[in-house]
């Protein structure tokens, strides 16, 4: 084994010289230089500096403006709540531990940090799945006369929290466990060992199938069908410029949504799966740290993709920030009018942009 396994930790370095110490008790500067921990802390501070205001603003603006309190926006708000979970449950903890160079908060802190970070990520992931299904049902109309109501939105919210907890809670209850990973100043699921009594293998397989592969398949299916529906509507109205514009708008949104999903999850999932299937192989502390912390940037681009590209929300946000006035009102108004025209045109072909 090219690492050192101890009680509730795994350090990716062989302890041939006796230098390896518990990541709960000693600085891990033998893994990487103190400067690397400082850079990690600075990166997390940047995510908090940007992620907290934009997600808090999303919640505040929606509460402030009644016209934004639509069933679909309930799911979008759930994304903001998930991102705030990551900010408070994971990012603040990592800043503190990276300042010390090890997981100074002990096993209880590791369990809490791992749980809240996993919960926030999973709520966000399953919120995207609910959004994809909603778009498919409303736009492609596999169920005739379906209307996404407040009850559907509430069921979607409950579903995301149930699924998120079905992934984040088991390691607290003995099915797998949370341990420090990478540079040993943040915690995640134990992909690294087959520790007796924790059944890590079965949990990791369950997590990858139910909490990665299935969501990925659902998102691709729903947005693939959405793209086909928009193209069919545009083909039926070859001379309609507004329909073509609507097709481009929906296509752009779909592409950005799928790319955001893949960019966030595939690097982390790929590295985690590699470590799980190659336990005992040699890898450095940065091998898991880089994709794990890159995935945390979802707290920034989630609201940008799913909310800030919404013209109505953008108008309300500017109005809130500018004390009730929108200095770009004429431009925003023209843009909103064009958007309504496009939506109306495409709606006649049973398609509506996001």
From Swiss-Prot:
Locate the region Disordered: 333-354
Membrane protein topology class: Multi-pass membrane protein
Keywords per UniProt:
Cell projection, Chromophore, Disulfide bond, G-protein coupled receptor, Glycoprotein, Lipoprotein, Membrane, Palmitate, Phosphoprotein, Photoreceptor protein, Receptor, Retinal protein, Sensory transduction, Transducer, Transmembrane, Transmembrane helix, Vision
Question: Which cysteine pairs make disulfide bonds?
Answer: 110-187
**Motif 'Ionic lock' involved in activated form stabilization positions after renumbering to this chain:** 134-136
One Gene Ontology MF term = 11-cis retinal binding
Q: Which GO terms describe its cellular component?
A: membrane; photoreceptor disc membrane; plasma membrane
Mark the transmembrane ranges. Answer: 37-61, 74-96, 111-133, 153-173, 203-224, 253-274, 287-308
Q: Provide the positions where the record notes the PTM N6-(retinylidene)lysine.
A: 296
Localization per Swiss-Prot or TrEMBL: Membrane; Cell projection, Cilium, Photoreceptor outer segment
Q: Which residues are glycosylated?
A: 2, 15
Annotated Pfam families: 7tm_1, Rhodopsin_N
Q: Topological domains (Extracellular): residue ranges?
A: 1-36, 97-110, 174-202, 275-286
Write out the topological domains of type Cytoplasmic: 62-73, 134-152, 225-252, 309-354
- Coiled coil ranges (UniProt) are none
Gene3D superfamilies, alphabetized: Rhodopsin 7-helix transmembrane proteins
PTM statement from Swiss-Prot or TrEMBL: Phosphorylated on some or all of the serine and threonine residues present in the C-terminal region. Contains one covalently linked retinal chromophore.
Q: Which CDD domains match?
A: 7tmA_MWS_opsin
Q: Which InterPro entries match?
A: GPCR_opsins (IPR050125), GPCR_Rhodpsn (IPR000276), GPCR_Rhodpsn_7TM (IPR017452), Opsin (IPR001760), Retinal_BS (IPR027430), Rhodopsin (IPR000732), Rhodopsin_N (IPR019477)
Q: Spans of biased composition, class Low complexity? A: 334-354
Q: Out of the domains of life, which is the source? A: Eukaryota
Q: What does the record list as GO biological process?
A: absorption of visible light; G protein-coupled opsin signaling pathway; visual perception
Q: Where is the lipid attached (S-palmitoyl cysteine)?
A: 322-323
Main function: Photoreceptor required for image-forming vision at low light intensity. While most salt water fish species use retinal as chromophore, most freshwater fish use 3-dehydroretinal, or a mixture of retinal and 3-dehydroretinal. Light-induced isomerization of 11-cis to all-trans retinal triggers a conformational change that activates signaling via G-proteins. Subsequent receptor phosphorylation mediates displacement of the bound G-protein alpha subunit by arrestin and terminates signaling.
In the record, the note on similarity to other proteins reads:
Belongs to the G-protein coupled receptor 1 family. Opsin subfamily.
This chain belongs to the protein called Rhodopsin
Per the UniProt record, the source organism is Poecilia reticulata
